[in-house]
Amino acid sequence: MLEATDVTRAPRRTAPPTWLVVALACAGQFLVVLDVSVVNVALPSMRADLGLDAQGLQWVVNAYAIAFAGFMLLGGRAGDLYGRKRMFLVGLGLFTLASLAGGLAQQDWQLLAARAVQGLGAAVLAPSTLTILTAAVPEGAARARAIGTWTAVGAGGGAAGGLVGGVLVDVLSWRWVLLINVPVGAVVLAGAALWLAESRAGDGRRLDLPGAVLVTAGLGTLAYGISQTEAAGWTATATVLPLLAGLALLGAFLAVESRTAAPLMPLGLLRVRAVASANVAMLLSGSAMFCMWFFMTLYAQNVLHYTPLEAGLALVPSSLAVILGSKLAPRLMRRMGARYVAVMGSLVAAVGFGWQSTLSVDGAYLTSIMVPGILMMLGAGLAATPLASLATSGARPEEAGLVSGLVNTSRTMGGSLGLAIMSTIAAARSAGSGAPGALTEGYALVFRTSTAVLLVGAVLMVLWLPRKPAASSPAA
């Protein structure tokens, strides 16, 4: 076991401006979220250059997502124990080096390995971005605005993936969807090394390696099973076995956590209403929102015959809407409370998804992409900030990194599960046909299903989310 130091805060020089700390944290979050989606428009070029088959193309996306989700809790706990700045630098360094390796890959396995290491680096980096930000900004309106900015930048990174990828592939090559991270990562690394102050929980507890291995293996195996559903179906052995194995590993994780003296995830956290309810709501919201970008891009290219760059440009208003929603949320939270803003955001998004489900083969841009896209993403931005605020408000300071990691894990795993289920629904409705009419029917059913998920999530928020952010509660 590795021992954590009990020093709570390293000596530092004059504190940097708060805006600079927020900017560095948000830059790290932007890179993490951007790489979830930026490779999508580059997949055909990757296939032609490296000889990837259909399964290989799937793993270009899944290798990152699985490693990201599977190692997230370990990254959050490591930040609490060994220092948020240190883990920020380690995670961003891994991410940047893996981006370089992926951009220079000459064989398919090299690209897939690089994507997995990117996901590992992102999992170490992402939890530290939020805890560094909340440590630098005093609690209250200023922190709510900072979290709103963090949420907006993260959402904007996901939204910008298609546009950035389209520009880079059209102007340069597929390799630059990865290589672009290298200069940006180097600049952020230098700024973080110079300006960020070190902080940690300082409780002297040891890193729970057995728990970390079990939860990472469980989430990774479960995510692998989910990724198999589109190709093999839900009842195939290739799907059922990893799903069962993943659930068994997660069960073993819970058993270990209930017995160890210094657990990776104190099970008492699950009894904190704010933490549990906000994370379940985040999982449901993520399962719908993640699918929006994927299926809107497919609809634009496969049905309306947009180029990758045109598809990215078509979604720019939606990208701006999610940023607007994230910036409006803190102001509305002061007037209405976090719970009602989260509910309102989910309902606005549900209206957009319902509208999008009326899409047609010859749909006009204004009514089939732009306006419903704006509503969907405005609602997403409004909901995400209060949910993140509620989740972190229920934790003790020494658990902040863990809860931050749990928020990101909930969103990512919800998105992975949602995408697998929605892809299966779309494929079943279109019966494997590539005709525009059949594809449109499949995509429409996906948006109707997502509408229902968001409405269920809104009801859950009304019944379960606390009216006000919780005071820090004991989690053990």
Map each language-model feature to its residues:
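Intrinsic disorder in cytosolic terminal tails and internal cytosolic loops
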Residues: 1-17, 201, 464-476
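Transmembrane-helix bundle of Major Facilitator Superfamily
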Residues: 2-194, 328, 336, 347-350, ...
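12-transmembrane solute porter fold
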Residues: 18-41, 54, 237-249, 261-433, ...
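Structural signature of transmembrane alpha-helices in multi-pass secondary transporters
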Residues: 32, 61-64, 68, 95, ...
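Interfacial helix-cap and linker-helix signal at transmembrane-aqueous boundaries
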Residues: 46-47, 78-79, 164-172, 226, ...
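Cytoplasmic-side transmembrane-helix entry/capping segments in multi-pass membrane proteins
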Residues: 90, 142-154, 204-214, 239, ...
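A residue-level signal for alpha-helical anchor/packing sites in multi-pass solute transporters
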Residues: 132, 136, 167, 195, ...
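Hydrophobic transmembrane-helix bundles of small-molecule transporters
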Residues: 148, 170-283, 288, 306-307, ...
